[in-house]
């Protein structure tokens, strides 16, 4: 295997991770603070529709796909260094599961334990041909999407991420701008079609979907189809979002303007868990549980964006890794790593 070129590819992945995190919090906050059901014809009702059209089930697929890419890169790099990549990866996902279990105590809808479990299931696929992984991932994703089986969605997405790593897609993006643009346009067309289909079932009244569907909700079948189609079309919109961002990143000015997103993504584990911490802290300090509205949840998320984006950029000016990324790395390799960046000599 050729040596893996890291810099540009990993930078691209960090932008995508950061972007995915921006969307994930908008949905997670709803359950964490038990957001109030919007009033009919209110701004909150409009924002709820926006979330279920453009955010819900549209961002975690990106994160799942990137986990698969990272899975491949981690083992490939370890093997290139002469280490046992499979054993190191097992230790890595064990530590991730521990992080996830602790996080689960505060956020029952957390994803780290799911990724760790899926990583264990996906390990044998590392040695399978990339063509087989791509075909299997597409078939599984189609099957899961048709049935809107959200709980199983990460599996095919991680497998597709693994195959993308095997194809070394993120090393070739600069050479395939036209292909990326065609893919993104195709995903845009499919996204428009999916959204129009979902719009046909948009519920007239706001709803509460935080702890299961309301039993006395009018037009229950319509609501179920609306939510079903939202999950089913999620990977398509995710692919469009990711493709559009990748096209933007081809421009140097876009990379500079979006550089805070890169730092945000480099500290994805720290920021994902601290999102929960900041939401729960705000809920406790400002008595937001069961009282906050949909629109107010957006303002709180924007405040958390500012805090985390600034913190990530400042932290990485002086440190090599995010706080939890550093702990994760040391527990994976069972040795200490310096966290501070070396100061350049005058």
Swiss-Prot record:
<dbReference type="GO" id="GO:0005886">
    <property type="term" value="C:plasma membrane"/>
</dbReference>
<keyword id="KW-1133">Transmembrane helix</keyword>
<feature type="transmembrane region" description="Helical">
    <location>
        <begin position="229"/>
        <end position="249"/>
    </location>
</feature>
<dbReference type="InterPro" id="IPR007349">
    <property type="entry name" value="DUF418"/>
</dbReference>
<dbReference type="InterPro" id="IPR052529">
    <property type="entry name" value="Bact_Transport_Assoc"/>
</dbReference>
<keyword id="KW-0472">Membrane</keyword>
<comment type="similarity">
    <text>To E.coli YeiB, B.subtilis YxaH and B.subtilis YrkO.</text>
</comment>
<feature type="transmembrane region" description="Helical">
    <location>
        <begin position="139"/>
        <end position="159"/>
    </location>
</feature>
<feature type="transmembrane region" description="Helical">
    <location>
        <begin position="182"/>
        <end position="202"/>
    </location>
</feature>
<feature type="transmembrane region" description="Helical">
    <location>
        <begin position="15"/>
        <end position="35"/>
    </location>
</feature>
<feature type="transmembrane region" description="Helical">
    <location>
        <begin position="269"/>
        <end position="289"/>
    </location>
</feature>
<protein>
    <recommendedName>
        <fullName>Uncharacterized 39.9 kDa protein in amylase 3'region</fullName>
    </recommendedName>
</protein>
<keyword id="KW-0812">Transmembrane</keyword>
<feature type="transmembrane region" description="Helical">
    <location>
        <begin position="55"/>
        <end position="75"/>
    </location>
</feature>
<dbReference type="Pfam" id="PF04235">
    <property type="entry name" value="DUF418"/>
</dbReference>
<keyword id="KW-1003">Cell membrane</keyword>
<feature type="transmembrane region" description="Helical">
    <location>
        <begin position="295"/>
        <end position="315"/>
    </location>
</feature>
<keyword id="KW-0813">Transport</keyword>
<feature type="transmembrane region" description="Helical">
    <location>
        <begin position="93"/>
        <end position="113"/>
    </location>
</feature>
<comment type="function">
    <text>Involved in transport.</text>
</comment>
């Amino acid at each position: 295997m050729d040596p893996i070129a890291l810099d540009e590819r990993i930078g691209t992945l960090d932008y995508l991770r950061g972007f995915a995190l921006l969307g994930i919090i908008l949905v997670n906050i709803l359950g964490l603070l038990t957001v109030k059901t919007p009033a009919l014809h209110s701004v909150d009702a409009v924002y709820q529709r926006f979330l279920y059209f453009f955010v819900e089930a549209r961002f975690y697929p990106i994160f799942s796909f990137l986990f698969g890419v990272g899975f491949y890169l981690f083992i490939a790099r370890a093997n290139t260094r002469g280490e046992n990549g499979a054993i190191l990866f097992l230790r890595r996902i064990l530590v991730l599961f521990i992080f996830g279990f602790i996080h689960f105590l505060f956020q029952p809808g957390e994803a780290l334990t799911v990724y760790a479990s899926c990583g264990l299931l996906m390990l044998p696929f590392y040695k399978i041909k990339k063509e087989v992984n791509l075909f299997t991932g597409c078939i599984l994703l189609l099957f899961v999407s048709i049935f809107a089986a959200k709980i199983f969605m990460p599996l095919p997405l991680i497998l597709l991420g693994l195959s993308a790593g095997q194809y070394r897609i993120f090393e070739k993006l600069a050479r395939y701008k036209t292909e990326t643009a065609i893919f993104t346009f195709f995903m845009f067309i499919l996204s428009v079609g999916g959204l129009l289909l979902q719009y046909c079932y948009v519920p007239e009244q706001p709803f509460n979907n935080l702890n299961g569907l309301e039993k006395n909700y009018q037009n229950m079948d319509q609501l179920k189809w609306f939510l079903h189609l939202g999950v089913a079309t999620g990977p398509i919109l995710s692919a469009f979002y990711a493709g559009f961002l990748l096209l933007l990143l081809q421009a140097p000015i876009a990379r500079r303007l979006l550089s805070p997103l890169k730092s945000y993504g480099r500290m994805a584990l720290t920021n994902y868990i601290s999102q929960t911490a900041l939401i729960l802290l705000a809920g406790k300090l400002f008595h937001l549980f069961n009282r906050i509205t949909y629109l107010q949840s957006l303002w709180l998320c924007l405040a958390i964006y500012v805090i985390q984006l600034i913190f990530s950029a400042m932290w990485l000016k002086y440190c090599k890794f995010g706080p939890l990324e550093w702990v994760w790395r040391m527990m994976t390799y069972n040795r200490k790593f310096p966290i501070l960046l070396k100061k350049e000599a005058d």
